[in-house]
Regions:
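Short, glycine-/small- and polar/acidic-enriched structural segments
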Residues: 2-105, 109-112, 121, 128-135, ...
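Pocket-lining segment of extracytoplasmic ligand-binding domains
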Residues: 114-194
Length: 194
């Protein structure tokens, strides 16, 4: 990022809704999250809505975590079970919905718990399964709090999962920064892949 002239401060927004709130308020120039939040804001009629200008990932990175080891897990095992799936309308929850609908699984998806509190809710006894990202999923398994039984992304296939978005005015006023950020991300991705 320094090669492109950036002094970057990364902050965990705690979900696409909070990330877009930071972009809209001006406390963040660029948000990195699922593309759905930018769409919801545009549909809402914002005069300076965020626009997606780059995509980083193309697959859901979450894992399905069970309370007990299930070495022979099948998606059909979720029938009649409760799953903490994320915020309703968020890409993680929509991807999970897609997976179980495609497989014809009738499960109860719990959308009542904020993304930042899903793992704590699961640990406290809410739901039979929970979707978790790394490193949390592996940490839970290492601590005996839960067991990874499936990869949501492996089952869902490719989707535009995470992207970069900024207010339209910021993009129009800072095209060199937008292009520089994308170059920096491309360089970083190539570095990681080598």
């Amino acid at each position: 990022y320094e090669e492109e002239g950036f002094e970057v401060e990364f902050t965990n927004g705690g979900g696409a809704d909070n990330t877009m709130a930071a972009v809209l308020s001006g406390s963040a120039d660029v948000g990195f999250c699922g593309p759905e939040a930018a769409l919801y804001i545009a549909i809402g009629g914002s005069s300076d809505s965020p626009k997606v200008f780059g995509q980083l990932t193309k697959r859901d990175g979450s894992f399905l975590v069970a309370r007990t080891p299930e070495p022979d897990f099948k998606w059909s095992d979720l029938g009649g079970k409760e799953i903490l799936a994320g915020r309703k309308g968020g890409v993680p929850a929509m991807t999970f919905e897609y997976v179980i609908e495609e497989l014809g699984v009738n499960a109860s998806l719990n959308y009542d718990v904020d993304f930042n509190y899903m793992t704590a809710a699961f640990e406290s006894g809410i739901a039979d399964y929970c979707t978790m990202f790394e490193p949390t999923a592996s940490d839970y398994e290492a601590e005996g709090k839960g067991y990874i039984v499936a990869s949501v992304g492996e089952q869902s296939g490719e989707i535009p999962y995470t992207c970069f978005a900024a207010k339209e005015s910021y993009i129009n006023e800072n095209p060199e920064k937008i292009e520089g950020l994308l170059r920096a991300v491309t360089k970083a991705t190539k570095f990681v892949m080598e």
